Design a protein with these regions (language model features):
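A short glycine-rich, Lys/Arg-flanked "PGG" loop and its adjoining helix->strand segment in the class I
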Residues: 275-288
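Conserved Class I S-adenosyl-L-methionine-dependent methyltransferase catalytic core
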Residues: 30-157
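S-adenosyl-L-methionine
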Residues: 205-250
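Conserved SAM-binding loop of SAM-dependent methyltransferases across substrates and taxa
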Residues: 172-185
Length: 447
C-alpha cells in the first residue's frame, strides 16, 4: 500500500512534509478527527471556518425566532403544523451540526497577521452551508445523478485503473467514494476546503450514518418543509481512501504524484483564471497521467475573457501540456430532490486529457494584494471602488433618513435637495433599495 504522507508537500513552500510538518516553514499541520488540515495557514483557516460556523449558527437562531413569532400570530391548524415542523427542524439541525462540527471548536489561537502575510483565505462567497444539499443528494436521494456522474468518469478512464487518484473539489465525496470502491486503486485522495462536507462524508464513508435535516427549496407538501435524513454509504470505504482539508489553489502535494486527477464541478467555479488553474492541475500529474473534468463548464469569472467556451477550453488545455483531449456532452438531472418542486436538467461535459509535457507554472496563488497585506502601499482608486464609494454614501444617507416618520416621497425630495438625484429617479431608486432591505430581512437560508 502506498504511504499517503509520501505524496504530501507544504502548501507554503512546496517542500516535502515530514510527519505532517514543514521543517523549512516551522509549521505543524494539525489532524482533527482523522482529517489533516493542509491549508497554508492551518490555524487561521480553522479560525476562519469557526467564525463562519458561529455566523451560520446566528442565522439559524434568527430563522428559528422568526418561525416562533409566526407561530404566535397564526391560528390556522394546517399552517401551525407546518410551522411547528419547521421550528423543530431548525432546533434538531442545530444539534446535528454541533455534533458534526465539533472539530471547529478546537481551533488554535487566531494568527491574523500570518494569515494575511500568506495571502490565503477561503473564498468569501463560500459558506459552510453553500453545498449542504450535495450531502443529501450524494448519500440519500440522488442515486440516478450519482451513477451518471460515476459512469461518465469511469468511461473516460477507458479501462485504466490508476494507482493514485486525486479528486479536487471532492465536496460530499460520493464520486470519490464510488471510484475508490470500484477501481481498486491503491490510494484515492479527496480534497475539499469545506469542513462540513468533509466531516459529514468522513463519518458516512466509514460506516457511521449521519443525521441531518433537509429544508427543500420548494417543498411539495407541508410535511416536506423539514425532513430528517439518514445519510449513509452502501458499504464502509475500503482501505486507502484519504480525505484532506485544503485549498486546491495551493494543493499540498508533490509534483507528478498522481496517475489521475478528477475535477468534478470544479474548474468553472474556482476563483482562479483557467489559464492558471490548468497548469496547476498539470503539475499534480505524472507524465501520461489522465485529467478528467466533469461538469457544466459554465465559467463564473469577472473577466469576460476567462468565460471559456468548450473549444477555447480544449485549446487552452493543449497549450498547458495536455494531449489526446476528448469531450463527451450529455443532459443529466441535477439536484432533483424528490420532495421539492425545484430541480433542473444540466448539460454537462466530460473532458478527458492526457499529460504530455510539463506546463509552465504560475506564481503561487495569492488571495490578497500587497496593499491590503502590508498596509504600506497606496490603496488604488479603482473604478469599482469609486462606484462603491458613491453607492455606499447614498445608501448611508438613505438609512439616516429612516426615522419612522418620513415617507418614501419625503426621502426622495431630500435626495433632490442634496443634488444627489432628480426626484423621479430618487423615488425609483429608494423604492428598489427598500425592497431589497425588506426582502433580505425575511430571507431564508439553506441548512
Amino acid at each position: 500500500m502506498i504511504d499517503f504522507t509520501s505524496l504530501l508537500a507544504c502548501p507554503r513552500c512546496d517542500k516535502p512534509l515530514a510527519d505532517l510538518s514543514c521543517i523549512a516553514c516551522r509549521v505543524d499541520f494539525p489532524v482533527r478527527d482523522g482529517v489533516p488540515w493542509l491549508f497554508a495557514e492551518p490555524d487561521a483557516a480553522m479560525t476562519e471556518w469557526h467564525n463562519r460556523w458561529q455566523l451560520a449558527l446566528a442565522n439559524l437562531n434568527q430563522d428559528k425566532k422568526r418561525v416562533r413569532a409566526a407561530i404566535g400570530k397564526n391560528s390556522d391548524p394546517q399552517t401551525l403544523v407546518r410551522l411547528e415542523l419547521l421550528q423543530r427542524g431548525y432546533v434538531e439541525q442545530k444539534k446535528c451540526l454541533t455534533r458534526l462540527l465539533e472539530p471547529l471548536g478546537l481551533q488554535a489561537q487566531a494568527d491574523l497577521e500570518t494569515h494575511l502575510a500568506l495571502k490565503t483565505r477561503p473564498p468569501t462567497q463560500q459558506g459552510l452551508f453553500t453545498y449542504v444539499a450535495n450531502l443529501h443528494r450524494d448519500w440519500c436521494w440522488g442515486e440516478e445523478e450519482n451513477q451518471f456522474g460515476f459512469g461518465a468518469i469511469k468511461a473516460a478512464l477507458q479501462g485504466i485503473e490508476p494507482d493514485k487518484i486525486l479528486v479536487l473539489g471532492a465536496g460530499a465525496a460520493r464520486l470519490a467514494y464510488d471510484l475508490h470502491q470500484s477501481l481498486e486503486s491503491a490510494i484515492t485522495v479527496a480534497l475539499d476546503f469545506n469542513p462540513l462536507l468533509v466531516y459529514a462524508a468522513t463519518n458516512i464513508i466509514n460506516g457511521n450514518p449521519v443525521t441531518l435535516w433537509e429544508f427543500p427549496l420548494a417543498p411539495k407538501r407541508s410535511e416536506d418543509v423539514a425532513i430528517q435524513r439518514i445519510l449513509s454509504a452502501p458499504d464502509p470505504v475500503r482501505e486507502g481512501f484519504h480525505y484532506v482539508l485544503g485549498d486546491a489553489l495551493r494543493a499540498p502535494f508533490k509534483p507528478g504524484q498522481f496517475d489521475a486527477v478528477i475535477t468534478p464541478w470544479f474548474i468553472d467555479v474556482v476563483e482562479e483564471a483557467p489559464a492558471k488553474m490548468i497548469p496547476r492541475i498539470n503539475r499534480l500529474l505524472g507524465h501520461g497521467g489522465v485529467w478528467i473534468n466533469y461538469g457544466s463548464l459554465a465559467f463564473d469569472q469577472t473577466n469576460p475573457a476567462n468565460r471559456l467556451s468548450l473549444p477555447e477550453f480544449i485549446s487552452l488545455s493543449t497549450h498547458c501540456g495536455f494531449t489526446d483531449i476528448e469531450a463527451v456532452e450529455a443532459t443529466v438531472p441535477y439536484m432533483n430532490c424528490p420532495d421539492s418542486r425545484h430541480g433542473r436538467l444540466e448539460d454537462v461535459v466530460t473532458i478527458r486529457a492526457v499529460k504530455q509535457t510539463d506546463a509552465s507554472q504560475p506564481e503561487r496563488h495569492q488571495a490578497l494584494p500587497d496593499w491590503i497585506v502590508n498596509g504600506k502601499r497606496p490603496v488604488p482608486l479603482t473604478q469599482s471602488f469609486q462606484s462603491q464609494a458613491t453607492i455606499t454614501r447614498i445608501h448611508a444617507y438613505i438609512m439616516s433618513l429612516i426615522d419612522g416618520k418620513r415617507t418614501l416621497e419625503d426621502m426622495a425630495g431630500m435626495l433632490e435637495q442634496q443634488k444627489l438625484m432628480q426626484k423621479a429617479a430618487a423615488t425609483s431608486a429608494i423604492r428598489g433599495f427598500l425592497i431589497t432591505m425588506f426582502e433580505e430581512q425575511g430571507s431564508g437560508r439553506g441548512y
